[in-house]
Amino acid sequence: MSRKKIKNPLIKRIPKEIIGDWKKYLVVFLFLVLTIGFVSGMYVANDSMLTSADEGVSKYKQEDGHFELKDKADSELVTAIESGEVKTAPDEKDSDSSKTPVTLYENFYRNETEDYDADGKKDGTIRVYTKTEDINLACLVKGSFPQNENEIAVDRMHADNVGMKVGDTIKVSGKEFEVSGLIAYVNYSTLHEKKTDMMFDAIKFDVAMVTKEGFDRLDKSIHYTYAWKYKDEPADDIEQKEKSDDFLEAMVSQVMAAGNEVEDYTPRYSNPAINFATDDMGSDKAMGGVLLDILIVIIAFIFAVTISNTIANESSAIGTLRASGYTKGELIRHYLSMPVIVTFLAAVVGNILGYTVFKDVVVGMYYIKQGLGQRFGQLGLANARGAKEQEAADGSIGVSDTGAAAQD
């Protein structure tokens, strides 16, 4: 009984000491809540969006890579390339490369000039594709897919940056098109025009979709680009690189034998338009963890200084408590209890806010910063904002020509 009576005064001192220095503890509490909440939200948002990126590879039929030929390939050349076999001359040794069979898909486009403000001046380059249900599908973010030769769907991120909206009329190489919808292509998570670009440009570069008739209205030369999917999916990045090297040798040999030329070759792993966003989120997640560690060390230092000052100010009271029979361990636990309580409460509140509020903030930042749309962020946005929005998003994609969710 006597032991309990001795402990009670220390326990009663805790709320009094917190109230006495409430401004100091409030600042530390808010700092911890914001730090833990933001980092927690970043982890939740990044994990959900990276998961959506992985699922989007199959759902939206993302390419394993693409190459461009000088001239359109005939059916015989397409079949030869799909075989994955190296074409060798009769007097040459067989290649050491493994046979890498693939499936090829036409993914032709035209690079046209874009005038989105109807001032008669070139505002940028717009890469125009036709609607397809086979490879590199697009997700409808707003509006509808083009239904006739006068309609066009443009990239959501580009539209947001230049103030373009559904229903606007733009000029593509002098031809007028009505913006029917805003889309997000699975192979353009960011708007990199070239694979050598260090940074994407969502203002001067745009990707768009038109009907076949709309494509025929345009005049610029066609880029004969073929996307491929491996018959046997690589298990990891290392195998993907090996398959890509083997396929490159086979493809080039077949193209040269047919008298054609290879203009470009871009496997998926080296395509910044596909990988930049996920790489960026992965680095942000790691940076968030390091930032949290640094801030926790800073907070620990602040608490150490605070406790030291408190002990110095209450040295006489501590002497009285020691004379009353309190051990050093009991006094240490008492003066540590206030920082521990503040840190624990801040961690609880911070994680609650991280899972409910800050994850939406982080998703919104990526949504604005990069062309994530629903094609990439659909699952991430749904995980971060609830199943109700996911159902609404699925409803818009299910009737699309290019999203083709109904076919998946």
Feature locations, PLM:
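Membrane transport/envelope proteins' first extracytoplasmic loop
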Residues: 2-300, 309, 328-329, 364, ...
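Interfacial "coupling" helices/loops that link adjacent transmembrane helices in transporter permeases
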Residues: 13, 19-21, 301-340
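Small-residue-rich transmembrane alpha-helices
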Residues: 304-309, 314-316, 340-371, 378
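A short glycine-centered flexible hinge/capping loop motif at secondary-structure junctions
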Residues: 325-326, 346, 350, 389
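Short, intrinsically disordered low-complexity segments enriched in Ser/Thr with adjacent Pro
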Residues: 380-389
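Short, composition-biased linear "edge" segments at structural boundaries
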Residues: 402-408
